[in-house]
Amino acid sequence: MSRYCVIGSGISGATIANLLSEKNSVDLFDTAKGPGGRSSFKRIDKAKGFDHGTQYISPKSLAFKKFVNFLIKKKILKKWRGIHLFLNKAKKENKNHLKIIGRKGNNDISKNILKNINCYFQTELKKIDYKDKKWVLTFSDGNRKIYEKLILTCPFAQLSKLSKEFIKAPFIKKKVKMDANITVMFSIKKTNNKDERQLIEEKNFE
């Protein structure tokens, strides 16, 4: 049994950690407060929150479709039947385009497949060393941990900074620009006032 460390709790990191855990010891680390990565969920209280990463998933491959259908049967995912506006005038809308979301949030996939994995959140990997055929990892809280195997699923900028000393493949030297994305998240309280309800409905369709 090997001792693995996986950096990143998005769908890729969570899937890798889950598969490796069948025959190995696995720890997973992420800088965020919880799992999800690019499909993270921003909670504003115990009952409400926002999907501020992935809006939905639309499985294409047969293997992924089977996995998604399995999670739908387990009531972890569901079909998104809300009202959607297709605004791309240069492309024809696919009326049969399937939209799948988490029942509680789009990080439900990661949460489900990581439920039996040792996860450490709000912990950033700052430095990697390789000594005596082991990976020595230094984290933002000053802790150092040693692993036989290391898998990085973090964004490219972080990956390049941490691993360029060890990865000799040409891709690591590429300059990948990641554009900032501004997301506005707001909630509206329900009201019994007819005029206020009408104003909200009008604003939603402007």
Segments from the language model and where they lie:
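Central helical "cap/lid" subdomain
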Residues: 36, 147-198
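N-terminal FAD cofactor-binding segment of flavoenzymes
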Residues: 19, 40-84
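N-terminal Rossmann-fold NAD(P) dinucleotide-binding loop
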Residues: 13-14
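A conserved short coil-to-beta-strand element within the FAD-binding core of flavoproteins
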Residues: 121-136
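Short hydrophobic core segments
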Residues: 5-7, 29, 125, 144-159
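Glycine-rich FAD pyrophosphate-binding loop
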Residues: 5-7, 18-46
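Short beta-strand to alpha-helix junction loop
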Residues: 56-62, 89-112
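Glycine-centered tight beta-turn/hairpin loop motif at sheet-sheet or coil-to-beta transitions
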Residues: 140-142
